[in-house]
Amino acid sequence: MHYAGAFRFACAYMSGHFADPVLLENLQRTLTAMPPVAAMGIRIAGYDNGVLRMQAPLDVNINDKGNAFGGSLASVMTLSGWALVSMRLGLAGQQAEVYVADSNIRYRAPVYGDLLATARLAPDQDWDEFLTTFSKRGRARVTVRAAIEGGAAEFEGRFVALGKG
């Protein structure tokens, strides 16, 4: 890889475009340590270019109608947003506690297979601005959008990061 290519790769990595396997493993361990999350079988499926993917099996998230329980859909989307913000903060070398402040969910269709969610920053959000605010104030907020594969459900939530220490 020539110098310009290596520089672009380093910039992309530092700006949170690529996953750090150790951060992903630590996030998964944190998720699994929460009894409700462990019971739901939620797993991080990957992170690339600012998008976090999360999955959960239908068989432990099924309702009386044979499709995914709405609460499970809400949980997977909320947790995918939480994990996205946590991952990107970790990639930026920041330690923070991340909380969901508020959210809105639209259920559009039943889900009859495994739950697959993707989370990304809302289009009007600027990650660099978020990091600048976080660095200056020790707290910042950012809006994340998540969706269940196929458009079955959509989530928009505001997450708050509070610096540790």
Task: Annotate the PLM regions.
Residues 84-124:
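Hydrophobic beta-strand-centered segment that forms part of the acyl-chain substrate-binding groove
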Residues 57, 61-81, 95:
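Hot-dog-fold acyl-thioester-processing enzymes
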Residues 38-42, 101-107, 128-130:
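Short structured motifs
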Residues 37-39, 49, 98-102, 112-116, ...:
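Short connector loops at helix/strand junctions that flank enzyme active sites
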Residues 1-55, 94:
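Non-catalytic linker/capping segments at the edges of enzyme domains
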Residues 71-75, 79, 102-106, 121-123, ...:
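Hydrophobic alpha-helical segments of small multi-pass membrane proteins
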Residues 2-16, 111-112, 122-165:
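HotDog/MaoC-like acyl-thioester-processing domains
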Residues 54, 101-103, 117, 142-144, ...:
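Hydrophobic residues positioned within well-ordered beta-strands of beta-sheet architectures
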